[in-house]
């Protein structure tokens, strides 16, 4: 397995992984790939997972999407992708968020040393919890 920055040639494979979950942001993701803000985890020629981030959150780095193929979840892959983004953001404060209902992501944030930064009621009944870490 390897983790590397996604390139435009990876778009189709990344969108295939993305569409394993409800998805409607293809163009935004394409733009982030072009800017070098998407890291992918590959096995051979196959994209297993990706993480997308940018500095559009109050000019701070923010991980806005992590997707792991359903058959590869709960194997530490998301943590490896977070480590790759954290390395790129060394010396900064990195933010991310997840819905209250996403227990696996809350556990990942705690394991990686993130602290709770706040909460917004974006989805009725399933608020968004924000986390951050100083790198």
Feature map (PLM): residue ranges:
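Short hydrophobic/aromatic beta-strand or adjacent loop that forms the aromatic wall/cage
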Residues: 36, 126-131
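Conserved acetyl-CoA-binding loop-helix of GNAT-fold acetyltransferases
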Residues: 68, 74-87, 107, 111
């Amino acid at each position: 397995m390897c983790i590397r920055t996604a390139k435009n040639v990876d778009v189709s494979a990344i969108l295939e992984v993305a569409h394993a979950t409800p998805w409607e942001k293809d163009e935004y993701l394409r733009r982030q790939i072009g800017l070098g803000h998407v890291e992918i985890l590959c096995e051979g020629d196959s994209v297993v997972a990706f993480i997308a981030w940018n500095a559009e959150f109050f000019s701070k780095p923010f991980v806005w999407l992590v997707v792991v193929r359903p058959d590869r979840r709960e194997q530490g892959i998301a943590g490896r992708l977070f480590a790759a983004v954290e390395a790129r953001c060394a010396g900064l404060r990195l933010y991310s968020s997840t819905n209250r209902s996403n227990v696996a992501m809350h556990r990942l944030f705690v394991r990686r040393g993130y602290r709770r930064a706040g909460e917004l009621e974006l989805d009725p009944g399933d608020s968004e919890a924000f986390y951050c870490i100083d790198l």
